[in-house]
């Protein structure tokens, strides 16, 4: 009888902590019609010791399934030439194949941060990012900050800036649609970046959208925490809280009409914007300060 009970406990425990296979995640994304956004693998720096880093969820806005990411305290990993653990980082991300620059690309994401999401600001939290290679440097990030969802033309490649896309009051507990269009072109007279949030134009940038060394780039998304010591210092703790996000309807195409229907494309392309809400990031701000958001003209983005 005792052996039988132990066996049952083992089976239940094994099922509870079984890791989701990459093939299951890819299948769920494919069912939503991912277009050219074909995932390659789990990021190699996702911790193999993580409890439930990436899983398929029945909570969805597109189709029947979404992808759930979870990051817990201490879930970091290393490779021969780099260690997230030794560099103040934790991550759980999906990784995509390298693609060439100077190509017009349209991306769509639906993200959901729970109402009770544990913000780690002022530490950095990247939800979506593109990196160029040789050298490996960030181009663009969609981040979660004290100001909410922000668009970051990253300081690795451009003049660092944070445009507020959606405040926390509207972001948390609601699905958010992100549509991002760029051509990853390094020339200032040819490059562009546009961002629509829930169908509303938030960024319309004309200028360099890459560097001369960015011939190849790749997408990764999920939860990428960095500079965690800032959170620990500000809140006097050594433990990072659990972080959870859902992604759904992830898709990439070469034109708007392939990404979404033509009527919606016309509505998106007919919009214009004259000013942005710029977030002035403070490394050790405990909360959003009144003077941390400034309205500036759209040509202020460099």
Feature-to-residue mapping (PLM):
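Low-complexity, Ser/Thr/Pro/Gly-rich disordered linker/stalk regions
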Residues: 19-177, 182-302
């Amino acid at each position: 009888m005792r052996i039988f009970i132990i066996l049952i406990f083992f089976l239940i425990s094994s099922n509870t902590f079984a890791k989701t296979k990459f093939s299951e995640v890819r299948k769920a994304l494919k069912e939503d019609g991912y277009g050219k956004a074909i995932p390659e693998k789990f990021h190699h720096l996702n911790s193999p010791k993580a409890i439930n880093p990436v899983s398929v969820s029945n909570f969805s806005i597109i189709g029947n399934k979404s992808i759930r990411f979870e990051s817990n305290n201490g879930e970091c990993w290393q490779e021969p030439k780099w260690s997230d653990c030794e560099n103040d980082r934790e991550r759980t991300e999906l990784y995509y194949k390298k693609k060439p620059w100077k190509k017009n690309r349209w991306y769509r994401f639906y993200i959901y941060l729970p109402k009770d999401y544990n913000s780690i600001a002022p530490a950095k939290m990247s939800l979506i990012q593109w990196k160029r290679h040789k050298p490996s440097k960030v181009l663009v990030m969609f981040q979660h900050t004290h100001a909410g969802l922000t668009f970051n033309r990253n300081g690795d490649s451009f003049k660092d800036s944070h445009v507020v896309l959606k405040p926390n009051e509207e972001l948390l507990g609601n699905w958010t649609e992100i549509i991002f269009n760029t051509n990853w072109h390094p020339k200032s007279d040819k490059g562009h970046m546009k961002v629509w949030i829930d169908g509303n134009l938030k960024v319309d940038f004309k200028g360099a959208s890459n560097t001369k060394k960015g011939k190849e780039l790749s997408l990764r998304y999920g939860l990428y925490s960095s500079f965690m010591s800032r959170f620990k210092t500000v809140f006097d703790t050594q433990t990072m809280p659990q972080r959870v996000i859902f992604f759904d309807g992830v898709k990439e195409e070469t034109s708007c009409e392939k990404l979404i229907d033509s009527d919606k494309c016309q509505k998106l392309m007919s919009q214009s914007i004259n000013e942005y809400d710029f977030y002035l990031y403070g490394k050790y701000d405990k909360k959003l300060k009144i003077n941390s958001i400034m309205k500036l003209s759209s040509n202020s983005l460099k």
